[in-house]
């Protein structure tokens, strides 16, 4: 049987990435051009800057991904691309490149939801058994997703306000930490003690919804009040207390979801899945189901995860037309 090579594109935010997946599970290349340095001075991603960077490097990323995979353009079987959610300008760059490549070579175009990509990155660890539950935690999303089979996703819980990664970055900005702040807060948290009493919103409520805005506001108020009074606060203890509150919320809701949806596998994915504190809590507290977390290199935004997610769409022959457009607010319930 002839090998299948999927060329995948990911440009939903501030990483330009192109990958090649051989058959169902052999990731031959996963080229990522990061823009973090360009956005650091702004304390967050500037959409116009992100789009410009994508345009500048995407051709080189395609060439590098093919070369690293050891294949030529003629070997590619299909093209997969993120079409949402994300920044509309950034998404359009990847869509334009993917559609151009697919059209020029007469290849099918596979539309992929960015968050489905995060979830299916777990396929790189081992074949997934369905049904399963997924906790997706990133800079833009915090969701609990029930997956009855590959490609069939249902959101069963989500944040009412800030995403968990967004809360990390906003708290980090207040403390003067470098963007993105998640990794540094995690490192500092492991050096401090949980001594500040921060709220755990809705932690005892019988639902699967998250809320981090109250926690974020409480942190900012404590920090600014101390500054106004000339008081000194331990950065390490602040980070430890903030992270403890975040993890308490995530763990409480995940446990409730596992009670409501009896599955054998929990996937934890997204940029925040790289958090050491979260991984420690999962290992200590979720012991009655298999927990699968993608490797660190596949936790952040990357085209490898888009390639993995595209396999189920390929199997269903869920191909897009040339009119496929960016959907910045795309949800699982509105996938093509």
UniProtKB/Swiss-Prot annotation:
Domain of life: Bacteria
Enzyme class: transferase
Compartments reported by the entry: Cytoplasm
Cofactor(s) this protein requires: Fe(2+)
Residues that hold Fe cation according to the record: 114, 118, 301
Family stated for the protein in its record: Belongs to the KAE1 / TsaD family.
Name the record gives this protein: tRNA N6-adenosine threonylcarbamoyltransferase
Source organism (scientific name): Streptococcus pneumoniae (strain Taiwan19F-14)
Taxonomic path: Bacteria, Bacillati, Bacillota, Bacilli, Lactobacillales
Encoding gene (name): tsaD
